[in-house]
Amino acid sequence: MRLVLLFLFLFYAASASTENLPQPPAHHLSDGTYANTNGVPYESSFKKLMQWSWERRSKDLSTFKFEMEKPNYKEIYNNDNIVTTWIGHETFLYQNKDINVLTDPHFTDRASPLSFAGPKRYMPPGMEIEDLPNIDVVTISHSHYDHLDYRSVKLISEKYEDVLFLVPLGLEEWFINKGIKNVRELDWWDSIKVSDTEITFAPVQHWSARGLFDRNETLWGAWHFKNYYHSFIHLGDTGYSDDFKEIRKRLGSVDLAAIPIGAYEPRWIMEVSHMNPEEAVMSFLDLEASKAIGMSWGTFILTDEPVSCLLYTS
């Protein structure tokens, strides 16, 4: 009888202690991967990719050249003003009178693991790395090759020894393996203060991978910056979701939002992970942003929408 009572005591004690353990966030799955806040997965089967590849054969995917404005280097090097410079694709130089931030830096010719194949840049960067002012922080939204470019981040880390790389959960190891040590990974809603600027990593609807077998093993998201003078959010890549309303609820409205408007066709394969221009406007309204800049267009031909349409939309 005593043995039975002892067993029951140990069983219920173990159950109670398990219940009191902190549970992982809902977007942390048991297999070590991550999920969107609403659980919506990105599904791209081999059959779908082959169908898309076949359909693209009959489409006009020619590039569209447009005139580039020269950066205002006087303002950029002054550092006493709030200046946001679109360098191309989703790369921005953001200066808020406190720190200089570079988002998703991509300065090379291809968005690809290969230097001789893959989507080729058809518009040069608005600035070259050697023309940049001092950079305090580099943010990476997710691991795709058009957002995390090895050669670009390596050159930046070599030029600016003290630059801090802020990356999604799971990506810190990649940077350390590449010899970049000053890196900090954040989960959704984690914040870090750099000088007088609060930087928060927020959820959006997307996915991650750098190879065939690492789907969603690292997180993805948006970067929100706020100090006394200004607030800015860089959404990265994202489909339309309620995440924008939650960002507004938790972090407040922003002065400026960098919103992706490209890489959205065909909708039957891109809808979950990329907004079209109409959805981009909806995200702008959800965020209650004062101003917005369209990004993720005019640099690489990644999907099927005409570039001329994006030029008009932006």
Roles of regions detected by a PLM:
Residues 151, 208-287:
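Active-site-proximal loop/helix segments of hydrolase catalytic cores
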Residues 117-167, 252-258:
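Active-site metal-binding motif and surrounding structural segment of the metallo-beta-lactamase
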Residues 103, 135-143, 166-168, 233-238, ...:
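Active-site neighborhood of phospho(di)ester-bond hydrolases with catalytic His/Asp-centered motifs
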Residues 3-12:
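Sec-dependent N-terminal signal peptides
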